[in-house]
Every structure is written in C-alpha cells, then in structure tokens.
C-alpha cells in the first residue's frame, strides 16, 4: 500500500495502452474493461438519484492524490466482498481526465481494486457536489454516500470497516 500512497506522476510501462484497451472495450464482457465507466457530472447525479431497491448502494468518492482515500480503499473492498449479496460498491474517481490512464490506473492496479470505478469528467463545474448530497459543503474527499430504498447516509470523512458495518445495519433496519 505504501507504493500506492506515493505520488503517481510517473507513467507505468504500457499504462496508456492498457487503459486505452480498457476504455475501448467497455461494451465487451471483459471484467477488467467493464470495471471502468466514464461519465459527466449530470449522468453521475442521475445515477446516484436512482433509488436502489434490493441492495445497499455505496458510492465512495476518491482521488489518486488523496492519502486518506487510498488508505480506506482496502477497507471498502473487504466490506463489499463480505457483503456481496447485500451491497453494491462503486468507487467514484474525482481525478482529472489527464491522469485517468496514469495515476488512476496505477492506484487500481496497486490496490487490486475489483469494484466498479466511475471516472467523472467534471470540467470546471464544482457545484454538482451539492446535488449528490446537501451535506457536501466543502470540496473535500474522501466522501461516501450509502443509499437504500429512500434512506441515505452521507459521510464527509475517511471511514473504517466498523463504520461501514454500522451504517449498513442502520440502513437495513430503517
């Protein structure tokens, strides 16, 4: 994990070609290609607004340069695997488009991330955060949103596995 926390400015051998392959084959059944989805902020807002009926949906907003984000990613991966029948986790990368094929890909490989990763093309609009949750008042990460039926839990801080477990139980009993 220490290697993942360092600065991700160097280009990994073949990283651009590998990432280009992932993005170009997103329509295939290839699991690696299906892991990455690009979208703009309007699409993100629409997807987050959809009410999950059968599983708790967990959105973890992160970036490759955010040390607290990188530290919590393994906790989220373990949580999602332990609760695969009841939880759907999505990692939402807020990295700039220019580092998707370098820094983001390197973090994904280094931390062995297996859950879906949404790459958000934010442009210059930062007001979209308030549409995700009114509690998102600062442009800070990590941020996590958990939704289930009509219930939501919003966290503007790094989370530990224990906190994820507690939030899951709380949402399921509402």
Language-model segment annotations:
Residues 61-75:
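Conserved redox-active cysteine motifs that mediate thiol-disulfide chemistry
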Residues 2-15:
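Bacterial N-terminal signal peptides that target proteins for export
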Residues 24-25:
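C-terminal motif of bacterial Sec signal peptides marking the signal peptidase cleavage site
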Residues 36-56:
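A short beta-strand-turn-helix
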């Amino acid at each position: 994990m220490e290697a993942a926390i360092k600065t991700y400015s160097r280009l990994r051998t073949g990283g651009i070609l590998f990432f280009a392959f992932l993005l170009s084959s997103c329509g295939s059944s290839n699991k690696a290609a299906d892991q990455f989805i690009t979208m703009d902020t309007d699409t993100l807002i629409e997807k987050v607004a959809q009410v999950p009926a059968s599983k708790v949906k967990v959105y973890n907003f992160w970036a490759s340069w955010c040390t607290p984000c990188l530290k919590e990613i393994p906790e989220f991966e373990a949580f999602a695997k332990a609760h695969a029948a009841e939880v759907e986790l999505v990692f939402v990368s807020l990295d700039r488009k220019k580092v998707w094929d370098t820094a983001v890909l390197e973090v994904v490989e280094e931390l062995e991330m297996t859950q879906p990763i949404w790459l958000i093309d934010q442009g210059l609009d930062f007001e979209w955060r308030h549409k995700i949750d009114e509690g998102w008042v600062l442009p800070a990460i990590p941020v996590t949103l958990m939704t289930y039926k009509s219930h939501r839990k919003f966290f503007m801080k790094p989370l530990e596995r224990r906190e994820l477990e507690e939030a899951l139980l709380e949402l399921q009993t509402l």
